[in-house]
């Protein structure tokens, strides 16, 4: 299907290599998004059904990671589309594809996938964060909103990778971004990046957030 955006369930008999080709190269946005979702779900289901350990084994293959690298680096894809494609399928959707659901296992596998994306694409996430930061006065236009969403995703990934590697550079940058933010979107993106990463600076950001807004209804 091409130029399609409404929810639809497709039953396509394509190989993993064909899905990877679509994800990396298809000019149609819907096909690219669908390929990414299919590949991520297939990887999660294969991992869960095989009873693998997400703490010691990789969930995502090198082909998928390389395709996502191409998406992030692509100069002609807009920020909104990149953020959409890089968003993994939800735990709810993954669970719906299983005959028997263990919520904790599904959560652990999806978190392992996020960490793998964070660690494998660190250079791309850093470039993405710097390129999509919106400086100056707040503007609610579509382009600025898309850049804020993508830079927020990049910051979350960088904080996640930093915590895993035992460094505080990106969590410290997230805290500074929280303090310097001139709008709620940027402030909340920085807060979420810290909280999701589990870094100790999240407590400081939450305390600051409470102090700033405790008197607002």
PLM features: what roles do these ranges have?
Residues 1-217:
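Long, ordered, helix-rich scaffold segments
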């Amino acid at each position: 299907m091409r130029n399609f955006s409404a929810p639809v369930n497709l039953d396509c008999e394509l190989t993993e290599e064909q899905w990877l080709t679509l994800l990396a190269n298809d000019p149609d946005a819907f096909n690219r998004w669908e390929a990414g979702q299919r590949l991520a779900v297939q990887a999660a289901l294969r991992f869960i059904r095989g009873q693998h350990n997400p703490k010691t084994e990789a969930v995502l293959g090198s082909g998928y990671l390389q395709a996502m690298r191409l998406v992030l680096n692509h100069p002609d894809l807009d920020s909104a589309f990149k953020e959409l494609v890089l968003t993994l399928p939800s735990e709810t959707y993954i669970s719906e594809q299983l005959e028997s659901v263990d919520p904790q296992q599904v959560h652990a596998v999806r978190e392992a996938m996020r960490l793998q994306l964070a660690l494998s694409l660190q250079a791309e996430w850093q470039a993405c964060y710097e390129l999509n930061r919106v400086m100056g006065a707040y503007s609610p236009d579509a382009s600025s909103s898309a850049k804020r969403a993508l830079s927020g995703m990049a910051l979350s990934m960088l904080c996640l990778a930093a915590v895993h590697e035992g460094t505080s550079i990106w969590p410290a940058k997230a805290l500074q971004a929280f303090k310097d933010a001139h709008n709620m979107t940027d402030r909340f993106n920085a807060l979420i990046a810290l909280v999701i990463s589990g870094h100790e600076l999240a407590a400081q950001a939450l305390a600051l957030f409470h102090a700033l807004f405790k008197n607002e209804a």
